Every structure is written in C-alpha cells, then in structure tokens.
C-alpha cells in the first residue's frame, strides 16, 4: 500500500498484515507540558522516531499503577505518551500488523486495554473500568472508548475507587474518583461528570 491514513476515533481493522510506505495518524496531540495522552497503533516503530516520551503498563502495587518508559513501540499494544509535537509519530515503510481480537497488557487483575472500534463499557461487581481524560484516569460506571484510545480494566471485586498513577516512579495524578463516606462522583470515559455523590454500590 502506498500510504495509510488512520483517522482518529474512526474504526480500523486489518484482516491481514501489509506494508505501507507512509502512514498518517490524523490526530492532534496536546503538547502542553506533562500532558498525558493514550494511544494504540497497528504498526511498530522505534521510540527514537517518536517526538515525546512513551510509557508502557508495568505493574500495580499498593493501589498504584506503574508505567515505565518504553524502549520500543509495538504494534497493537496500548501506551501512554507525553507528546512534544502535535503529530509525534513519523514512520515510513512500516509493516501494519493484522488486528488481533484482544489488545491488552496484563498484570495480575489489571489490564491496559486498547481498541480500534468504539466500545461501550459498564463497570459491575466483577469488572471496573478507568478511562483517561484531562490528565488522569477516572472511574467510569458506564462509558464509550473510542478507536485508538486506551483504558484500564480491573477484574477484581476489591478494585479501589482511587489509584495513584506513576510514570517511571514519579506520581503524576490520581486514577479513579473520591469515595468519601461511601459516596462517589460518577464519570464517563470522557471524564464528564454524570452523577455527583451517589452511593458507591450504584
């Protein structure tokens, strides 16, 4: 294929692998200092070809989600990025991999999940979803994850309401919502407040 254009928030699927001479991911990333965005792409590249710092999910310890600096960007693997350019990805002559059924980096009961299709999610007694918005992950009772974006999924009935986020050992924010006195603010996956101070069980 001479060129491949990936349109942000629009579905993508590659039934089989192919090579593209040029790739354009049509998305404007924020270049605000320390602004964290999420992404998943269908091709690999060197981190030296990315304008910004890329981080991959590493572990969850003591209610803290740890991400570490990535040494490479793998196809179909979810990442976080602190971009230094609006279009931080430059790639030519890339192999676009076939789209897998699942795109997850798993550690214990937690997974960093990516998608190329719009996904409707509902947190319940066994699964809790955290969507990334406005510089932090927020707990979502219900929400929509758009193509080329990522989220955190906890398959643990004891998933906490809040989780600290660390990038290379540095705390950057809070994952989740305040659950003071058993009440929580309910957000959707875009970080918009849906209901304020409702019972945590609802």
Go through each PLM region and give its residues.
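A short, polar beta-strand/turn micro-motif
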Residues: 1-51, 68-172
